């Protein structure tokens, strides 16, 4: 098999001397050449340790006769940019990470790639990039943080912050992050690590391993070795591995873990790079009868490290195995079914249980695997975790994580309280200007409006209020943190800046939410119910007076993103 790197050496005589100038030896030049791309940087705990894993990957590559070249494009942290204009860059950064992988991989010849990241935009950016360049590739998840004292995890800080603003707690509760890794709850970072493994692009049993575990170093080294192997095999490119069946497997795992709603932005965008169409309807259809099994925060009891101690993605897949496509290929060169059988016999689950016992000792508790990942016949829920709502308010759809929503809010009629920015809305919530029975709207926060930031602080201010958390809804064309809980509906499409119906909502409109029937409608005006025909006529009149907003960003990457971003329900990827 002729390697791309060796063919390019013949075409570009300056390539060899330039590489020797960066530390390659003449012997290295003739080896399998692997790009090792990470989001390493001092940007946040999820990326700060990846340089250590990169060196383990390179060691594994060398052990199998290859040479690994280090590249990186660090990611930003949604947590660090929350509540500032910095959060507007978050979703756009996913596209930039994918773009840099394309540039790095195609500007210089490589035979394979290993990609390392941990967090919200790094993981989907890596997966989009590896799909686009389509060289044999292995993804290495960066793992999760350990929980802190009293089992505190980072998603609780939004709630604590709202309580602090209301004078309910002191400042001491607000400051903590223990170690490297993704935040220790099933937010977007954890969800996307799990999705990478569920798609077959990461080695089995690697998602959400504690970042402090020495086993993570071993897996990184093995990923390097595997990259060299698949570089020399036929039909082991990402496009040979990932199919529609792979995505269906991932979505069923997403249902079982009650994954982040942001996955409805990321999986469709990744699928788009593979030439596969995934829509909100795909999620909704598969979630409707899927088992929800994982009792991990934010919807459950335990920190995310417990997911790995209970057996991780393989343990989830074992429980839902009869619904999965077990014949899909994976980066091991074996099918999913073969991988699951091998893990039963190689001591993987015994090692996980050993870690669980250490966790129990740390907190003086007695948690079992079944407490964390419920057996299939004792599922937490039988209708998945995500619903896509539609109606005259969201013709293209809107997303709710119903497993994190109080059941009394599943069928509601509420009064509309529209705001044209999150700042206005958050101020109203904190000053008690939002009342029981309100449907709070935050609009002009979609991809084209402002980059589609998270409405995390507003959602936490609502859900941490004992009365508001069970009596009002938050509806937006923006998105929510994977840590968000409560009656929150995002991705409302079309977005306001495109003239979607959310832009036409007025104070006092009656809003119908029906989760089980998948409805989101305006059903009344000024507190009075109207027929759907009357509502349509009134909205048509309002549209005549609606004026498109001038584009918010005049230059830079957010100008580019807001000009070309697709609809939230398509994945908000760049459409050129």
Regions found by a protein language model. Name each.
Residues 1-46, 55-73, 79, 85-90, ...:
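Catalytic or ion-coupling anion/metal-binding cores of large enzyme and transporter domains
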Residues 49:
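Glycine-/small-residue-enriched capping loops at alpha/beta junctions
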Residues 52:
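Acidic/charged coordination and interface sites in well-structured regions
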Residues 90-99:
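Glycine-rich, highly charged phosphate/nucleotide-binding loops
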Residues 105-126, 139-141:
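A short, small-residue-rich loop immediately preceding and capping a beta-strand
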């Amino acid at each position: 098999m002729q390697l791309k790197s060796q063919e390019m050496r013949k075409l570009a005589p300056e390539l060899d001397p330039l590489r020797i100038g960066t530390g390659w030896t003449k012997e290295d030049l003739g080896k399998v050449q692997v790009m090792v791309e990470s989001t390493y940087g001092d940007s946040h705990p999820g990326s700060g340790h990846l340089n250590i894993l990169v060196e383990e990957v390179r060691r594994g590559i060398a052990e199998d006769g290859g040479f690994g070249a280090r590249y990186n494009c660090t990611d930003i942290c949604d947590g660090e940019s929350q509540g500032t204009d910095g959060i507007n860059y978050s979703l756009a950064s996913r596209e930039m990470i994918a773009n840099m992988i394309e540039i790095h991989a195609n500007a210089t010849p490589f035979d394979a790639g290993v990609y390392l990241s941990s967090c919200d935009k790094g993981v989907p950016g890596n997966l989009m990039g590896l799909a686009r360049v389509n060289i044999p590739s292995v993804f290495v998840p960066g793992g999760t943080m350990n929980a802190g004292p009293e089992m505190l995890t980072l998603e609780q800080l939004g709630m604590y912050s709202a309580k602090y603003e209301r004078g309910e707690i002191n400042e001491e509760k607000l400051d903590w992050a223990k170690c490297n890794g993704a935040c220790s709850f099933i937010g977007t970072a954890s969800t996307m690590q799990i999705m990478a493994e569920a798609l077959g692009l990461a080695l089995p049993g690697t998602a959400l391993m504690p970042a402090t575990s020495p086993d993570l170093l071993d897996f990184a080294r093995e990923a390097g070795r595997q990259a060299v192997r698949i570089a020399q095999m036929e039909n082991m490119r990402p496009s040979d591995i990932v199919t529609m069946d792979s995505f269906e497997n991932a979505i069923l795992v997403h249902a079982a873990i009650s994954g982040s709603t942001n996955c409805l932005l990321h999986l469709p965008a990744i699928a788009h790079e593979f030439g596969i169409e995934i829509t909100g309807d795909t999620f909704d259809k598969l979630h409707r009868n899927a088992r929800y099994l994982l009792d991990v925060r934010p919807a459950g009891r335990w920190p995310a490290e417990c997911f790995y101690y209970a057996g991780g993605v393989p343990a989830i897949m074992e429980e839902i195995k009869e619904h999965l496509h077990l014949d899909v290929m994976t980066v091991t060169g074996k099918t999913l079914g073969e991988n699951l059988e091998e893990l039963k016999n190689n001591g993987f689950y015994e090692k996980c249980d050993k870690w669980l016992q250490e966790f129990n000792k740390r907190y003086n508790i007695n948690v079992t695997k079944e407490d964390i990942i419920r057996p299939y016949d004792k599922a937490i829920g039988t209708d998945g975790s995500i619903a896509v709502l539609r109606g005259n308010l969201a013709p293209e759809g809107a997303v709710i994580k119903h497993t994190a929503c109080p059941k009394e809010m599943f069928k509601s009629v509420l009064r509309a309280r529209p705001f044209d920015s999150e700042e206005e809305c958050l101020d109203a919530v904190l000053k008690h200007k939002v009342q029981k029975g309100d449907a709070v709207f935050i609009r002009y926060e979609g991809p084209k409006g402002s980059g589609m930031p998270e409405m995390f602080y507003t959602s936490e201010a609502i859900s941490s209020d004992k009365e508001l958390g069970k009596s009002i809804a938050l509806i937006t064309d923006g998105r929510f943190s994977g840590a968000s809980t409560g009656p929150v509906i995002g991705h409302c499409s079309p977005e306001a800046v495109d003239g979607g119906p959310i832009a036409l909502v007025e104070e006092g409109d009656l809003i119908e939410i029906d989760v089980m029937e998948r409805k989101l409608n305006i059903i009344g005006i000024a507190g009075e119910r109207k027929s759907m025909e009357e509502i349509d006529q009134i909205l048509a009149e309002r549209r005549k007076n609606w004026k498109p907003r001038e584009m918010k960003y005049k230059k830079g990457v957010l100008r580019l993103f807001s000009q070309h971003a697709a609809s939230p329900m398509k994945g908000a990827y760049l459409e050129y």
